[in-house]
Regions:
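Substrate-binding pocket helix/loop in short-chain dehydrogenase/reductase
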Residues: 104-105, 112-117, 214
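Short, small/polar-rich loop/turn modules that mediate ligand/substrate recognition or access, typified
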Residues: 89, 94, 182, 187, ...
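Active-site helix of classical SDR
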Residues: 128, 166, 174
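Residue(s) in the substrate-gating loop at a strand-loop-helix junction
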Residues: 148
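A conserved structural motif in NAD(P)-dependent oxidoreductases
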Residues: 218-229, 240
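Alpha-helical segment proximal to the catalytic Tyr-Lys
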Residues: 133, 179-183, 242
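Short C-terminal tail/terminal secondary-structure segment
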Residues: 2-6, 234, 245-258
Length: 258
């Protein structure tokens, strides 16, 4: 089998959280294009249904849509159970749902802090362990989490201590699970994107001054595109990455290099 053929995901069942838009939507489309059947999970069920239909029509993937609040353990467990029952297995997952709150630390409320931690870190824990239990029983599986370059550096000029802390936690949680499950057939990795120009970011007028500053600071002088994460995610979800576990892959246009 050639290298291109080995990157195919034919017959695999994969779910993506936060898949109704942005990085999650791009990931789901990539998995489906590579041959996988994909479950589109999001708290926004209308958006998830729309993306599931769009991807199914474009690729022939057997898609389903699932509503899930990743901070609710019972919803996460139900999501994973439904996906495993629908496809008869769970080969890989991309735990991607997340939010950012920009606020000076001295002004951030406990509620704001807790919301960021609950979604970005506890949500990843709940999804990873729920998927992990299925995969451990199978004896195989690949878990991919979304961390961030913000887990490696302190972003400026926007103050976002809660986001930074949550993403640093995702990175070490990923490594911890990778070590625990390494000999049980389950791989766990994360990606750490830099500034990615999703539609939600690029269409917000209030973010234009920040985007200009980010572009000026970055070595490439631009934001990344969701599509520029697709090949890495397909690699991590598939069998060619069989020796890759515990990795935190930074994709930031060299932003963290200085």
């Amino acid at each position: 089998m050639g290298i291109i053929e080995s990157m195919r995901l034919d017959g695999k069942a994969i779910y993506v959280t936060g898949a109704a838009s942005g990085i999650g939507k791009a990931a789901a489309a990539a998995f489906a294009e590579a041959g996988a059947d994909v479950a589109i999970a999001d708290i926004n069920i209308e958006g998830a249904e729309e993306v599931a239909k769009e991807i199914a029509d474009a690729t022939g993937s057997k898609t389903i849509s699932v509503q899930c609040d990743v901070t609710k353990q019972e919803q996460v467990e139900a999501m994973v159970a439904k996906i495993a029952e629908t496809y008869g297995k769970l080969d890989a997952c991309f735990n991607n749902a997340g939010i950012a709150v920009n606020a000076p630390a001295e002004e951030m409320t406990l509620e704001q802090w807790q919301k960021v931690i609950d979604i970005n870190l506890t949500g990843i824990f709940l999804c990873s362990t729920a998927a992990g239990r299925v995969m451990l029983k199978q004896g195989y599986g690949s878990i991919i989490n979304t961390a961030s370059m913000s887990g490696h550096i302190v972003n400026v000029p926007q103050p976002q201590c809660g986001y930074n802390a949550s993403k640093a936690g995702v990175s070490l949680l990923t490594k911890s699970l990778a070590v625990e499950w390494a000999k049980k057939g389950v791989r766990v990795n994360c990606i750490s994107p830099g500034y990615i120009g999703t539609d939600l970011i690029m269409t917000r007028e209030d973010l234009k001054p920040l985007i200009e500053q980010w572009n000026a600071m970055g070595p490439l002088g631009r934001l990344g595109r969701p599509e520029e994460l697709q090949s890495i995610l397909v690699y991590l979800a598939g069998d060619t990455s069989s020796f890759t576990t515990g990795s935190d892959i930074i994709v930031d246009g060299a932003f963290t290099c200085f």
